[in-house]
């Protein structure tokens, strides 16, 4: 966990902005029987993180005996430094309501919740879960989802290639992405477990971003971060086109414009503005014409 925070600080200095979140883990990261001590450690790491750090915590599921203590210790002691709480194994909006009520009993009632969707029932309720105002993001938990099918889905569906071809996994991914976009939330793609295979990582991240509608992706190893940023960021050509269209639109007070023989109006302005936002959030360099809109992170601009 400490190495992840150190890498985040190094890349923030490199890019001039924080380009990825760190989620400290209490669910799978805590030894059985040592959950309370692990929560204290996580709270301390979050409190001591760099000022520009974006740090969240994955607590235990709401029905786990350690959940209440996780929330009291971590949200209560480090809530002012956290960007989010990650809830694993959410089955319905009732789990979100329970977590929200628990948060309200701490000094971090403002914190958004990021939710892990990890079962067929949760996928079925993804739209309802995404609609809750406290929910910021839905993430797909691939391995738990496959395991929840009792052997009906082969192990190959958990691999980097198979997870994009098995029909039930593909359906789940698309449902989650669609639910997020319907309610203005962030869809976060699942991990790739082959952490030493950068070709597989790049291919999976590219498909998640280009074909499945995901705007973020989990990593499980530092070597995966740059391929994810590369895949989820726009190309330099995309950035140049978006910058020219947005600059021309601003000059026209956002009235329809003609650009290279094509009509653009507010619908396409929104799209190209989102291209620039993705460029900024993934550490891309921005043309001078659009830099003023992205201050104070002026170091990304020429």
Question: For each of these PLM feature ranges, what is it?
Answer:
Residues 1-302:
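Expand to "…catalyze enediolate/carbanion chemistry for C-C bond making/breaking, isomerization
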């Amino acid at each position: 966990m400490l190495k992840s925070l150190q890498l985040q600080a190094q890349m923030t200095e490199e890019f001039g902005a924080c380009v990825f979140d760190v989620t400290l883990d209490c669910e799978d990261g805590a030894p059985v029987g040592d959950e309370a001590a692990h929560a204290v450690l996580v709270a301390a790491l979050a409190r001591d993180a760099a000022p520009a750090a974006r740090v969240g915590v994955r607590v235990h599921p709401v029905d786990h005996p350690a959940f209440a203590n996780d929330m009291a210790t971590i949200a209560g002691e480090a809530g002012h430094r956290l960007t989010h709480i990650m809830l694993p194994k959410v089955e319905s909006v009732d789990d979100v309501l329970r977590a929200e009520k628990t948060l309200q009993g701490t000094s971090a009632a403002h914190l958004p919740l990021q939710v892990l969707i990890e079962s067929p029932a949760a996928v079925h309720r993804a739209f309802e879960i995404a609609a809750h105002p406290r929910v910021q993001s839905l993430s797909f938990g691939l391995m738990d989802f496959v395991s929840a099918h009792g052997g009906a889905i082969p192990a190959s569906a958990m691999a980097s290639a198979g997870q994009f071809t098995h029909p039930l996994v593909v359906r789940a991914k698309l449902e989650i992405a669609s639910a997020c976009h319907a309610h203005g939330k962030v869809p976060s793609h699942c991990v790739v477990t082959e952490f030493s295979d950068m070709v597989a990582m790049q291919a999976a991240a590219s498909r998640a971003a280009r074909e499945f509608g995901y705007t973020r992706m989990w990593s499980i190893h530092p070597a995966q971060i740059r391929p994810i940023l590369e895949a989820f960021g726009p190309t330099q050509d995309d950035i140049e086109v978006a910058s020219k269209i947005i600059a021309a639109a601003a000059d026209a007070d956002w009235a329809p414009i003609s650009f290279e023989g094509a009509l653009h109006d507010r619908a396409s302005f929104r799209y190209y503005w989102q291209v620039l936002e993705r460029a900024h959030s993934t550490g891309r360099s921005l043309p001078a014409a659009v830099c003023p809109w992205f201050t104070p992170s002026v170091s990304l601009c020429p």
